[in-house]
Amino acid sequence: MALPKLTTPTYELEIPSTDEKIKYRPFLVKEEKILMMAMESKENADITQAVKDIVSECTFNKVKIDDMPMFDVEYIFLQIRSKSVGEVSKLKLLCPDDKKTYAEIDLNLTEVKVQVGEDHTNKIELENGMGIIMTYPTIDSFSKSGIKDINASNMLDVISNCILQIYEKNGEKTYDPKDQTKKELTDFIEQLNTKQFKEVQKFFETMPKLKHDITIKNPKTKKESKVTLTGLNDFFA
């Protein structure tokens, strides 16, 4: 005799970058097991694949995970996690005042939003009608390149992966980065002067991020400090 099937609740959310409404469900025991095994391995590729698989399954395979900006995937996963194991996450955060003591806090995951920096734009004017149109890093671009976060050592690789278009004459002439070699893109980026390069960096600094400010109290010094959590890893510290 077949065993009865349990009813799984469904919820709705808006994808931050598009405002598109999608339905999702909590992850099940079999999916939680996949995530736990990936977390135990501490391999970035395993964790990324687990997050992708869970988001895909829990959104009923209705979204194209590989093409989504990283912050969209992180936000969706956070919502799935909050409905699966609880809206409150217990965190241990390093206190900024002495940089050695940890404070335990309860964070309501439903309060965490994707935030965009001031004056953010994906169109970067360089000179004389020439410029770059940028696109956001995807979870796949990070995974394939082995990049965990954006820093000085990998900035050129990240930039070249996120160029959507290079244009001249105010857009009358355009170049598709897919038609260029990696070296050609790197050479182009290295031609930028300091001011132009800072404008490109600003795109990444101000782009949408899973972000939340929280005040923590050092249990030893009793000093209160503001801590900014960014990216999925910070919310499960």
Regions found by a protein language model. Name each.
Residues 1-237:
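Long C-terminal interaction/binding lobes of large macromolecular proteins
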